[in-house]
Amino acid sequence: MSQPNTAAQFAASVVSETPEKKGGKINLLDLNRKQMRQFFIDMGEKPFRADQVMKWIYHYCYDDFEQMTDINKILRAKLQQVAEIRAPEVAEEQRSADGTIKWAITVGDQQVETVYIPEDDRATLCVSSQVGCALECKFCSTAQQGFNRNLRVSEIIGQVWRAAKIIGSLKSSGRRPITNVVMMGMGEPLLNLNNVVPAMEIMMDDFGFGLSKRRVTLSTSGVVPALDKLGDMIDVALAISLHAPTDDVRDDIVPINRKYNIEQFLAGVRRYLTKSNANQGRVTVEYVMLDHINDSVEQAHQLAECLKETPSKINLIPWNPFPGAPYGRSSNSRIDRFAKVLMEYGFTTIVRKTRGDDIDAACGQLAGDVIDRTKRTLKKRQAGEPIQIRSV
């Protein structure tokens, strides 16, 4: 068998090494409703039992079959023998002055990061899809950690379950329940579709977390073939990590652009929009503002021209620094000038408020604890380049 020749191909080829069963028991968090119903049918039970169990798991965040009082004792005993509800554990919690909470979540012998962001009218959970990331975007902390593996369904939906359980226990303190989930944490979701899609199905299932498809957002840096596949698998809100209006700049800061350039990426986005109701006809464009790299007035005009055939809402993101990064954050005046140009073209343009940067929980700062399998960190050491080491 030929070996993957790029980091992204390597990531796509790696399946989770976490076993499906622990101690001979299947983790029910790995199953969407269709799979859960088949599980109960195989046990000789009626498929509606799946709906009952899912409701206990996701509506009430129960992980003990004995608490499921509308299930008879015989079935509860059978479930204890063959199944479990095992979400990843929190290794550490950090709280920001602005109310943001970041959790280091243990997955096997490594850690990913999950962030809860409360606002006046919503509470968003930022969820990771991989241990590390293979795409090597230069302005992103996660990319500097290298890549190890894809997360399983249970490790993705388990982040939501764990956060919902914690937030539920904090209701007396006024914490808003999770209303939105964004797949914008560690990793490239489109390189882990086989696990990300079932997890998003559970997020939107009435017997799961019951979120509207407009409140579940997947963000991608531009894996175009997988984006086409996504459109045939599920309908969720789409955000794209564009970050540059021209290929010469994007080739440097988002290296996957060398394989799928801006024109190809946006064509894929338009194909997705024709299949999607969740997006209401337009995509959210994420654009990190890097001082004197991608933030000139000329580049604002270029971005507007670039997006003229792709209905878009644009989020301008002040860059969030991390140790060893070669960039600076654009000044407020440069960001304001950039936004003004885009609005003059008629684009809805928002300058995203930085949240959680005092605990390294802001956009682009998530790092976790990753055992790199791409040799990226080894190459940096050999070249004498700085390596960001995070202790969580």
From Swiss-Prot:
Binding site for [4Fe-4S] cluster: 133, 137, 140
PROSITE patterns from the UniProt entry: RADICAL_SAM
Molecular-function GO term, any one: tRNA (adenine(37)-C2)-methyltransferase activity
Binding site for S-adenosyl-L-methionine: 187-188, 219, 241-243, 320
One Gene Ontology cellular component: cytoplasm
Record EC number: 2.1.1.192
Primary residence: cytoplasm
Catalytic activity: adenosine(2503) in 23S rRNA + 2 reduced [2Fe-2S]-[ferredoxin] + 2 S-adenosyl-L-methionine = 2-methyladenosine(2503) in 23S rRNA + 5'-deoxyadenosine + L-methionine + 2 oxidized [2Fe-2S]-[ferredoxin] + S-adenosyl-L-homocysteine; adenosine(37) in tRNA + 2 reduced [2Fe-2S]-[ferredoxin] + 2 S-adenosyl-L-methionine = 2-methyladenosine(37) in tRNA + 5'-deoxyadenosine + L-methionine + 2 oxidized [2Fe-2S]-[ferredoxin] + S-adenosyl-L-homocysteine
EC supergroup of this enzyme: transferase
Residues of the Radical SAM core domain: 119-358
Localization annotation: Cytoplasm
Cofactor(s) it depends on: [4Fe-4S] cluster
Gene3D superfamilies reported for this sequence: 1.10.150.530, Aldolase class I
Any one biological process term the GO annotation gives: tRNA methylation
SS bond partners: 126-363
Protein family membership: Belongs to the radical SAM superfamily. RlmN family.
HAMAP family: RNA_methyltr_RlmN (MF_01849)
Additional information: Reaction proceeds by a ping-pong mechanism involving intermediate methylation of a conserved cysteine residue.
Role, per record: Specifically methylates position 2 of adenine 2503 in 23S rRNA and position 2 of adenine 37 in tRNAs. m2A2503 modification seems to play a crucial role in the proofreading step occurring at the peptidyl transferase center and thus would serve to optimize ribosomal fidelity.
Name of the protein in its database record: Dual-specificity RNA methyltransferase RlmN
Species whose genome carries this gene: Photorhabdus laumondii subsp. laumondii (strain DSM 15139 / CIP 105565 / TT01)
Gene expressing this chain: rlmN
